[in-house]
């Protein structure tokens, strides 16, 4: 229920950690790059996540420390109004301050296939349908400003802690 309503604080309290989505970075349409907002894209093959919307996030797996970002989790109503995405849910994450090695890796295509984990910290709003690319760009800029403002008032020590790869429990761990 907390995830469905976007109460990420309650969801984190119930889970004992922020709600996390992980997967392999996949190729997108490269439109984010053209608009000035490079993204790391994760697709959902079979299931739809419990939460959708625009979120303040932290990204793990790009370096030693987590990186702040803003992410869209949903079906992209402004870009896929005619359902060219087949109704599939995407997680498109824009890091607010790309580390230079990762910016270079994205340009060179080295990020594709890399496994990342994205923690959803705070929901900014539901998905919105914008009238054209200029309105979409303005909306993304505002989301980035709102994410920075949220992060400035909600200090999170996870950005300073080294990233550790979490492992799935094995059968022996559950016995």
Sequence positions of predicted segments:
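Phosphate/ribose-recognition catalytic cores of enzymes acting on nucleotide-derived substrates
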Residues: 28-175
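Anionic-ligand-binding alpha/beta catalytic cores of soluble enzymes and soluble regulatory domains
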Residues: 1-40
